[in-house]
Every structure is written in C-alpha cells, then in structure tokens.
Amino acid sequence: MKKNLFSCLLLLFCASGVFVSCGDDDEKTTVGYSGKDISGDAGITRDKETKKAVLSVDTDKAWELYAGSTAEDIDMNTPCLTGDGKGSFDLSVDAGKRSVFLFKTAEGQALLAERLLPVTAYNFRDLGGIKNKEGKFVRWGKLFRTDEMNKMTDADLTYLASTGLKTVVDFRTATEKEGGFGGMMPAAPDKLPSTVKNPYDLEINAGNIFSDEIIESISKGLS
C-alpha cells in the first residue's frame, strides 16, 4: 500500500513541469486546448493485440479530428476524420506507432491519445490529459506509469520507442528484479525500448518510503 502511494507521489512531482495551457478566450486555430473544455467529449482506445486505434465520440455536434506523431507535429491542414454526432470510429493511423490527436468542434478543441497503452505490461498508462485546478493539462506522451516492464514483446518495444520514452525509474527491490528465495521468485529484468537513455533504480523498501535519500532523489528530479 505504501509502495503504491509513493509511486503516485513521485509521478505527480515529475508531472509538475509538463502542463500546457487551456485558454478559454483563445479562438485561433492552434494545436492545443482552446475554447470550451471538450476533453471529455471524445477518447482514444487501442486494441492490445492489433494496436488498432478507435475514436469514441460523446457529443451531438459536428467534429473534426487531426493527427500527428506528437502534439507539435499535428497537421491542422487536413483532418484525418470528420463526423457529426456520437459513435465509435476506426482510425486509419499506423498501428505500430503512437499518435496524438486534436479533437475539434465549434465550441473548442482538445488533445487526445490513448490512456491505456496497448502493450503486455500491466496497467501501462499515459498520465497526459489530466486537468489541474488552474485549467491546465498534463502533456500527452511525457509521463507514464506501469506495474511492470519485464514482459514486453518486440512489437511492444517498437510501439514504446515511437513515444520517445527516454527515462525509466524502477521502484522495485534487487530481489524483485534479480530473483531470489531459492528460485521461488524468478528474475524479472526490465525490457526497455531503444530510446531509453536514462534508467534509474530507486528501490522502495518497507520503512524507507520517506527516507532522506528518497526525498533528495526526488528533489533532484532524477535528471
């Protein structure tokens, strides 16, 4: 319980510098959040096996969807899909690569990506799209959490590499990673995409959750 709690605290600390603005009075066609908050009117999901992307819409208004490999690369000249009203819609995007989308209606626009990544690791989630009390959003594709990275397939690693993932912080103990207890606990080393340049070990043991060493590591930002 303490371990899970601390993981959340660390992730929120790291997220403090990755917010983007949402200006309610911004009427320009920009790549980002603007106008009315419509972030809850649509969502992206991907099939875990095929990695096929689907858009789910929960608004009766006409809408447009634009796509790019990152928020900065979204092509606003040509929508990848348009519609009028609610429904689920298959997306013609590369199944092997991550995409970020901009969903737009007459009322506003919002960035979208799949919350639960289509990989074999349990509960691998993007923490992007979360709105804070100041009306700003965590950037998609900048901060993730997962319970494990030792069961990744080659397809999973290729997909994760397309996110540009660079830093991984492992909270597990040496025994959890290397195995122990006379073989009762098998070794479970992480499988990391080629883009990762900064792997960190930050062991969380019972009793050291709020130790000076842990707090100091967090304060330095692990970068």
For each feature predicted by the language model, list its residue ranges.
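Cys-dependent protein tyrosine phosphatase-like superfamily
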Residues: 23-223
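C-terminal motif of bacterial Sec signal peptides marking the signal peptidase cleavage site
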Residues: 18-21
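Bacterial N-terminal signal peptides that target proteins for export
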Residues: 1-9
